[in-house]
Design a protein with these regions (language model features):
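Acidic-basic catalytic patches of nuclease active cores, encompassing PD-(D/E)XK
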Residues: 100-122
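Generic structural marker for isolated residues within well-ordered, non-membrane alpha-helices
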Residues: 82, 111, 173
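Nucleic-acid nuclease catalytic cores
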Residues: 116-227
Length: 248
Protein backbone atom coordinates (compact mmCIF):
# COMPACT_ATOMS: atom_id res chain seq x y z
CA UNK A 1 0.00 0.00 0.00
CA UNK A 2 1.44 3.44 -0.89
CA UNK A 3 2.18 6.02 1.79
CA UNK A 4 -1.03 8.08 1.68
CA UNK A 5 0.44 11.26 3.11
CA UNK A 6 3.35 11.10 0.69
CA UNK A 7 0.92 10.59 -2.19
CA UNK A 8 -1.08 13.68 -1.16
CA UNK A 9 2.14 15.69 -1.06
CA UNK A 10 3.09 14.35 -4.48
CA UNK A 11 -0.22 15.66 -5.84
CA UNK A 12 0.40 19.08 -4.31
CA UNK A 13 3.86 19.05 -5.91
CA UNK A 14 2.33 18.22 -9.29
CA UNK A 15 3.73 14.69 -9.34
CA UNK A 16 0.46 12.72 -8.93
CA UNK A 17 -2.95 13.23 -10.48
CA UNK A 18 -6.27 13.25 -8.54
CA UNK A 19 -7.34 9.86 -9.92
CA UNK A 20 -4.17 8.26 -8.62
CA UNK A 21 -4.71 9.77 -5.17
CA UNK A 22 -8.36 8.72 -5.09
CA UNK A 23 -7.56 5.15 -6.14
CA UNK A 24 -4.97 4.75 -3.40
CA UNK A 25 -7.36 5.97 -0.72
CA UNK A 26 -10.16 3.79 -2.06
CA UNK A 27 -7.95 0.73 -1.81
CA UNK A 28 -7.08 1.61 1.79
CA UNK A 29 -10.67 2.19 2.82
CA UNK A 30 -12.27 -0.22 5.25
CA UNK A 31 -15.90 0.34 6.17
CA UNK A 32 -16.49 -0.53 9.82
CA UNK A 33 -19.44 1.65 10.82
CA UNK A 34 -21.96 1.84 8.01
CA UNK A 35 -24.70 -0.51 6.89
CA UNK A 36 -25.31 -0.73 3.15
CA UNK A 37 -28.47 1.00 1.99
CA UNK A 38 -28.88 3.12 5.10
CA UNK A 39 -29.70 6.27 3.14
CA UNK A 40 -31.50 4.82 0.14
CA UNK A 41 -34.68 6.62 1.19
CA UNK A 42 -32.99 9.95 0.43
CA UNK A 43 -32.93 9.10 -3.28
CA UNK A 44 -36.59 10.13 -3.27
CA UNK A 45 -35.59 13.80 -2.88
CA UNK A 46 -32.73 13.62 -5.39
CA UNK A 47 -33.91 15.39 -8.56
CA UNK A 48 -30.64 15.16 -10.49
CA UNK A 49 -28.14 12.37 -9.92
CA UNK A 50 -24.99 13.89 -11.41
CA UNK A 51 -23.49 17.18 -10.27
CA UNK A 52 -22.16 19.94 -12.57
CA UNK A 53 -24.10 18.67 -15.59
CA UNK A 54 -26.31 20.79 -17.85
CA UNK A 55 -29.41 19.32 -16.20
CA UNK A 56 -28.02 20.03 -12.72
CA UNK A 57 -27.30 23.66 -13.58
CA UNK A 58 -30.73 24.11 -15.15
CA UNK A 59 -32.59 22.77 -12.10
CA UNK A 60 -30.52 24.84 -9.67
CA UNK A 61 -31.33 28.05 -11.51
CA UNK A 62 -34.78 28.50 -9.97
CA UNK A 63 -33.77 27.31 -6.48
CA UNK A 64 -31.96 28.72 -3.50
CA UNK A 65 -29.15 26.21 -3.09
CA UNK A 66 -27.03 25.42 -0.06
CA UNK A 67 -23.85 26.85 -1.59
CA UNK A 68 -25.67 30.17 -2.16
CA UNK A 69 -27.37 30.29 1.21
CA UNK A 70 -24.77 32.27 3.15
CA UNK A 71 -24.61 34.97 0.46
CA UNK A 72 -28.41 35.24 0.34
CA UNK A 73 -28.45 35.66 4.13
CA UNK A 74 -25.68 38.25 4.08
CA UNK A 75 -23.24 35.91 5.82
CA UNK A 76 -20.62 35.72 3.07
CA UNK A 77 -18.39 38.76 2.71
CA UNK A 78 -17.15 37.46 -0.65
CA UNK A 79 -20.58 37.27 -2.31
CA UNK A 80 -23.93 39.08 -2.16
CA UNK A 81 -27.63 38.39 -2.82
CA UNK A 82 -27.44 40.75 -5.81
CA UNK A 83 -24.56 38.82 -7.37
CA UNK A 84 -26.33 35.50 -6.81
CA UNK A 85 -29.48 36.88 -8.43
CA UNK A 86 -27.61 38.20 -11.46
CA UNK A 87 -25.83 34.88 -11.99
CA UNK A 88 -29.11 32.99 -11.82
CA UNK A 89 -30.63 35.35 -14.36
CA UNK A 90 -27.70 34.79 -16.70
CA UNK A 91 -26.53 38.40 -16.43
CA UNK A 92 -23.11 37.37 -15.14
CA UNK A 93 -21.23 34.09 -15.23
CA UNK A 94 -18.83 32.61 -12.71
CA UNK A 95 -16.48 30.36 -14.65
CA UNK A 96 -14.48 29.21 -11.65
CA UNK A 97 -10.85 29.88 -10.81
CA UNK A 98 -7.73 28.02 -9.71
CA UNK A 99 -9.09 27.72 -6.16
CA UNK A 100 -12.43 26.18 -7.11
CA UNK A 101 -10.68 23.88 -9.58
CA UNK A 102 -8.27 22.71 -6.88
CA UNK A 103 -11.20 22.02 -4.56
CA UNK A 104 -12.93 19.92 -7.21
CA UNK A 105 -9.72 18.04 -8.02
CA UNK A 106 -9.01 17.15 -4.39
CA UNK A 107 -12.57 16.44 -3.24
CA UNK A 108 -12.51 12.72 -4.00
CA UNK A 109 -9.17 12.23 -2.23
CA UNK A 110 -10.44 14.14 0.82
CA UNK A 111 -13.58 11.98 0.99
CA UNK A 112 -11.52 8.82 0.62
CA UNK A 113 -9.25 9.90 3.46
CA UNK A 114 -12.34 10.71 5.54
CA UNK A 115 -13.57 7.18 4.94
CA UNK A 116 -10.23 5.72 6.01
CA UNK A 117 -10.01 7.79 9.19
CA UNK A 118 -13.65 7.42 10.30
CA UNK A 119 -14.63 3.99 9.02
CA UNK A 120 -17.70 5.47 7.33
CA UNK A 121 -18.70 4.77 3.75
CA UNK A 122 -19.77 7.84 1.78
CA UNK A 123 -22.51 7.70 -0.84
CA UNK A 124 -22.58 10.28 -3.63
CA UNK A 125 -25.70 12.32 -4.29
CA UNK A 126 -26.64 14.93 -6.85
CA UNK A 127 -29.10 17.78 -6.43
CA UNK A 128 -31.52 17.22 -3.56
CA UNK A 129 -34.60 19.27 -2.69
CA UNK A 130 -36.51 19.84 0.50
CA UNK A 131 -39.73 17.77 0.60
CA UNK A 132 -41.54 20.76 2.16
CA UNK A 133 -39.83 23.59 0.24
CA UNK A 134 -39.13 22.30 -3.30
CA UNK A 135 -37.43 25.59 -4.17
CA UNK A 136 -34.75 24.87 -1.55
CA UNK A 137 -31.94 22.69 -2.87
CA UNK A 138 -28.47 21.45 -2.20
CA UNK A 139 -25.81 19.08 -3.53
CA UNK A 140 -23.88 17.50 -0.66
CA UNK A 141 -20.37 16.28 -1.27
CA UNK A 142 -21.56 13.04 0.24
CA UNK A 143 -23.73 11.31 2.83
CA UNK A 144 -22.51 8.39 4.89
CA UNK A 145 -24.54 5.22 4.88
CA UNK A 146 -25.31 5.82 8.54
CA UNK A 147 -26.75 9.27 7.80
CA UNK A 148 -24.13 11.98 8.20
CA UNK A 149 -23.87 14.83 5.70
CA UNK A 150 -20.29 15.27 4.48
CA UNK A 151 -19.16 18.67 3.22
CA UNK A 152 -15.58 19.03 1.96
CA UNK A 153 -13.35 22.06 1.46
CA UNK A 154 -9.78 21.91 0.19
CA UNK A 155 -8.32 25.42 0.53
CA UNK A 156 -5.15 26.47 -1.23
CA UNK A 157 -4.14 29.48 0.86
CA UNK A 158 -6.84 29.88 3.54
CA UNK A 159 -5.73 28.81 6.99
CA UNK A 160 -7.46 25.80 8.53
CA UNK A 161 -8.32 26.76 12.10
CA UNK A 162 -8.57 23.72 14.40
CA UNK A 163 -12.16 22.99 15.41
CA UNK A 164 -13.63 25.93 13.49
CA UNK A 165 -15.81 26.32 10.39
CA UNK A 166 -15.61 29.54 8.34
CA UNK A 167 -18.85 31.48 8.79
CA UNK A 168 -19.76 31.37 5.10
CA UNK A 169 -19.94 27.57 5.21
CA UNK A 170 -22.08 27.07 8.32
CA UNK A 171 -25.27 28.10 6.50
CA UNK A 172 -24.45 25.68 3.69
CA UNK A 173 -24.12 22.78 6.13
CA UNK A 174 -27.29 23.71 8.04
CA UNK A 175 -29.32 23.96 4.82
CA UNK A 176 -28.11 20.53 3.70
CA UNK A 177 -29.24 19.04 7.02
CA UNK A 178 -32.59 20.84 6.76
CA UNK A 179 -33.17 19.46 3.25
CA UNK A 180 -32.21 15.88 4.08
CA UNK A 181 -33.67 15.81 7.59
CA UNK A 182 -30.35 14.47 8.91
CA UNK A 183 -29.18 15.53 12.35
CA UNK A 184 -25.40 15.68 12.01
CA UNK A 185 -22.79 16.69 9.46
CA UNK A 186 -19.03 16.36 9.19
CA UNK A 187 -17.22 19.39 7.81
CA UNK A 188 -14.01 18.07 6.26
CA UNK A 189 -11.01 20.21 5.37
CA UNK A 190 -7.81 19.03 3.71
CA UNK A 191 -4.83 21.13 2.76
CA UNK A 192 -2.21 18.51 2.04
CA UNK A 193 -1.10 15.44 3.99
CA UNK A 194 -0.40 17.26 7.26
CA UNK A 195 -3.49 19.47 7.38
CA UNK A 196 -6.69 17.51 7.63
CA UNK A 197 -9.55 17.90 10.05
CA UNK A 198 -13.14 16.82 10.60
CA UNK A 199 -15.49 19.09 12.54
CA UNK A 200 -18.82 17.65 13.62
CA UNK A 201 -21.83 19.94 13.25
CA UNK A 202 -25.19 19.27 14.87
CA UNK A 203 -28.40 20.38 13.22
CA UNK A 204 -29.69 23.62 14.71
CA UNK A 205 -33.46 23.26 15.26
CA UNK A 206 -33.87 27.05 15.20
CA UNK A 207 -31.91 27.66 12.01
CA UNK A 208 -34.84 27.36 9.58
CA UNK A 209 -37.22 29.46 11.68
CA UNK A 210 -34.58 32.17 11.95
CA UNK A 211 -33.77 32.38 8.25
CA UNK A 212 -36.89 31.17 6.44
CA UNK A 213 -38.31 34.66 5.83
CA UNK A 214 -35.18 36.02 4.13
CA UNK A 215 -34.72 32.90 2.01
CA UNK A 216 -38.35 33.00 0.88
CA UNK A 217 -38.08 36.70 0.03
CA UNK A 218 -35.02 36.06 -2.14
CA UNK A 219 -36.71 33.16 -3.91
CA UNK A 220 -39.82 35.27 -4.56
CA UNK A 221 -37.63 37.97 -6.09
CA UNK A 222 -35.80 35.39 -8.22
CA UNK A 223 -39.07 33.87 -9.45
CA UNK A 224 -40.42 37.32 -10.28
CA UNK A 225 -37.35 38.15 -12.39
CA UNK A 226 -37.33 34.78 -14.14
CA UNK A 227 -40.97 35.25 -15.14
CA UNK A 228 -40.52 38.88 -16.19
CA UNK A 229 -36.92 39.71 -17.20
CA UNK A 230 -37.75 43.43 -17.30
CA UNK A 231 -37.80 43.34 -13.49
CA UNK A 232 -34.20 42.14 -13.31
CA UNK A 233 -31.67 44.44 -11.64
CA UNK A 234 -29.67 46.72 -13.88
CA UNK A 235 -26.04 45.67 -14.28
CA UNK A 236 -23.53 47.98 -12.67
CA UNK A 237 -20.45 49.34 -14.37
CA UNK A 238 -17.59 46.90 -14.08
CA UNK A 239 -14.86 47.85 -11.69
CA UNK A 240 -11.23 46.84 -11.81
CA UNK A 241 -11.01 43.09 -11.25
CA UNK A 242 -9.89 42.05 -7.79
CA UNK A 243 -7.65 39.04 -7.17
CA UNK A 244 -9.36 35.66 -7.01
CA UNK A 245 -10.58 34.58 -3.58
CA UNK A 246 -9.73 31.15 -2.25
CA UNK A 247 -13.17 29.51 -2.00
CA UNK A 248 -11.68 26.22 -0.76
Amino acid sequence: MPNLRALCQAYLDGEADPDQVEEAFREARGCTKCDTGGVDHLRAIEVCRAQRTVEWKKKRRSMVTASECAAVLGQNKYDTPQKILMRKLGMTVFKGNKFTQHGQDMEAAAIARYEVETGHTVETFGLMVSPDEPWLGGSPDGITQCGRVVEVKCPVTREIVPGEIPRQYMAQVQQLMHITGLEVADFVEMKGPEEFQIVEVKRDPDWWNTHEKKLREFHARLTECLEDPTLAPKPRRRKKKKPDFDFG
